[in-house]
């Protein structure tokens, strides 16, 4: 079963493959907004994370996280409800394969969480985020008619269309502010770097959700030149380099960062 469900809350989630089966990917939760925002604030103010991210505001404040989480909860509410209905319907039939699964246009599984145990029972902690959205073709010259044309075409393709180009990442909109991203904001807490978690998170999102439930055929991603960890994540998931764009990201004085170059990667299919 690609999508798992908490038997008590009926929350849908993805589970990472071994040896990371204690890591799950869930939607954001209304009852954990403050806790998750605090975890986000800690990670996104760490130079081992924010150095490689163009979009999130810096310094990142708890209210930024709360606004973001509330937005994502609303965006994914319908998908989460549909999945819970699927779970309930399948539970009432002897053969779960009798129910046809819907095709969706978004991935509600954003929160990378580590599941632990304490005296009160099972708990989990937010340790990162992963997002899957329609690709923005940010390698094309900004504010050009070519960019507007390809973005409009990709956006207008109907749900499940095989020609949709997707990307790992997201565009951040916080309150009345707009932060235009030119590469993904996926991140992992530095306390969990170097353990293969993000590689397996990408694998789970692609294999267990994007391909079977979004009919995904085309996927691209990018990373800042010098980010060795991100390159490894892509390569382990069968991505190949298709281009390098020098000085593509503007200076970020708040982070004391100059212009940065990006590498575009393209997915070559399931391994």
What is each model feature region?
Residues 48-95:
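Conserved GNAT-fold acetyl-CoA-binding loop/helix
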Residues 32, 61-64, 104:
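Soluble or luminal CAZymes and related metallo-dependent hydrolases
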Residues 1-32, 36-37, 43-48, 111-271:
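Acyl-donor (CoA/ACP) binding surface of acyl/acetyltransferases
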Residues 78-101, 106-113, 129, 165, ...:
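Short hydrophobic/aromatic beta-strand element in the GNAT-like acyltransferase core
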